[in-house]
């Protein structure tokens, strides 16, 4: 629950510091929300953090590229961006990160 709590609190820096411990926590695959968070972090922080022995699913990278494209298209109007992204990505970590108020 430690890593999930970091995501709920939108603490991506501490999440990225601790993601190498994924195997220590018993994971054999990167959970989808962890993967989404790490792809977002790597993109916006210009990093290449991937836990040893793990890889990103191509479909998640493709979804992120689609998300980023829609966000870029509507970024001048946050309400419209939220609406458009919500149509397809409402259940993604990316949407939570950018639009959920905690």
Locate predicted features.
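Solvent-exposed soluble domains appended to multi-pass membrane proteins
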Residues: 1-102
């Amino acid at each position: 629950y430690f890593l999930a709590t970091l995501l709920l609190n939108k603490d991506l820096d501490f999440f990225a510091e601790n993601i190498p411990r994924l195997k220590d926590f018993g994971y054999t695959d990167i959970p989808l929300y962890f993967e989404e968070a790490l792809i977002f972090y790597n993109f916006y922080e210009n990093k290449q953090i991937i836990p040893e022995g793990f890889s990103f699913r191509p479909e998640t990278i493709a979804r992120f590229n689609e998300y980023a494209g829609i966000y870029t298209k509507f970024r001048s109007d946050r309400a419209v961006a939220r609406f458009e992204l919500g149509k397809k990505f409402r259940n993604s970590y990316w949407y939570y990160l950018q639009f959920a108020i905690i």
